[in-house]
Amino acid sequence: MENIPPKVQNQLAMLQQLQQQLQTVAAQKTQYEMAIRESRRAQEELKDIPEDAEIFVNVGTVMMQEKKPREVASLAEKVETLELRVKSLEKQEKAMQARFEQLSTDIKGSLDRKKPPVPPTAE
């Protein structure tokens, strides 16, 4: 690392940080997508039961009775909110990926310019 210019060292550090941020965003997106699938599965289950059926909902470690229309509305709102979060994360991910690629290209260009020319081999 000692023969790499400080500017390139800083760019490498930024690249590593950006890579970690990309991994974090991807993990969050995966969690939200799983929550969406789970909520949609619950919505499908609720379609098959009568409007006046007893429904129980987990609230932390407690199960509470809830009216079906209220829970259906709650699930719809939850899915909508999660979908918005996923879209936001996708935008962030796309911007970060573009920045990552640009930074990678800049670093490669800087390192290629710094390399001494390879002498021709004698045959």
Residue spans of the language-model regions?
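Extended, charged amphipathic alpha-helical "stalk" segments
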Residues: 27-33, 63, 69, 119-120
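Amphipathic alpha-helical coiled-coil segments
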Residues: 11, 15-32, 36-39, 46, ...
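Short coil/loop "hinge" linkers that interrupt or connect long alpha-helical coiled-coils or helical hairpins
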Residues: 45-71
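Extended aliphatic helical segments
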Residues: 8, 25, 57-62, 72, ...
